[in-house]
Amino acid sequence: DVRTLGIAGGSMIVVRGGKIADVGPRSAHIAEKEYEVFTDTDKMKNPKIELIAPREDDTSDYAVVACANGESYALTLAGAANILGYVPADDYAAGNVESAKIAWGALASMTGSTVEELCRQAMDIAMTKVGEIVKQLIADYNLNPNLICLVGGGGSASVVVPYLGEKMGIRH
């Protein structure tokens, strides 16, 4: 049984009405933007939030941080997970937490929230989506949640699995 959902480390943050409204389905890759968390800190000068349309037919509500070097970087789920400490230092998805905090700090200034609050909001939105699929699999196969262990694969496994396991009370 395979089910697909557009949530991963590169999933971009959607901002509407001055707050996080969604995560994904567009990714940094689709938008052709670097992840904030995989960017050198020295590139994060004078950060300002801009809202873009990753593809021509998308709405302009995906957050990027535009910097003094003329480049802009996507705010991503990987950035949020790194800031919150869910990604181990030696993991493929581990990045530059300082850069991510600078980028998310620009969003915090715009929204009147804190960096940690915003990261948790983004993770909660994304994991609610993933959690619904896990709940459906549990129901479809009549599984005992106490016997389940979540296992992730790919570069985004540590971005998704630890937070999802914690949120759902399932081992990982």
Please state what every model-predicted region is.
Residues D1-H172:
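N-terminally biased helix-coil "hinge/interface" segments that flank
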